[in-house]
């Protein structure tokens, strides 16, 4: 698993949401809400867990990843409900979404260092 790439992909969610807001597109909120559907989620719940599941850095990354997807799912639901101003505000600076985005990125970077991957 390339954790640098995983960090990038999770950072890109803000741009995906902004594009969906502008284009007024529907999103798969149910899948976005789940922390085991994206590539890093599958890895965290599979190989990552079996190899590094006892490391505190792994447990933190797993927790932060779950929180990220829960918050991302809320944004997707706002978009699907056509609450575009609310969705845009939800991904702005200083929001819970921004905070969990930073936290999951930091947690994945710390896991990478601790696991030597």
Regions found by a protein language model. Give the residues of each.
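N-terminal membrane-sensor/transducer module of prokaryotic signaling receptors
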Residues: 1-117
